[in-house]
Amino acid sequence: VSSSADEPDADDLRVAIVRILADPDSGRRVTREANALLDANDPEAMRAWLETGYRIAQAEDDRVAITRLLADPDSGRRVIAEVNALLDANDSDAMRAWLETGYRIAQAEDDRVAIARILADSSISPALRAAANAALDDNTPEALRHFLEVGRYQVA
């Protein structure tokens, strides 16, 4: 039973933590801390973590995810430049926002450059040229990435 009508009870706190665990953006630290809280079953600790600890854990997980992009061979110049700027700024809110929307946009720009490089090769087949142009015509981040990861290998 909640001590106040506005405060979530223990079951509400557990549900909130389980929802965080179900989020694919939850990294290792968030997962580790959330599981430990569920195991301990301490409503006050859960409340405190949801109020402040979760943001701290998510910020660390976001920093790790962003840093890993530096080692990813698919990360092009725009992604790397934006990652370095984010790491220099050290703003956890900016990192979260970039992971949610900015990364997709930066990767799409890098993918457009990669496809343009493929098209610049005069020895590619007409089918590969058509598939590359179709990806550029579609111009969605998903179509560009799909062409680079799958589509270019499916044409003769």
Regions found by a protein language model. Give the residues of each.
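Extended, compositionally biased repeat/scaffold regions that form elongated interaction surfaces
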Residues: V1-A156
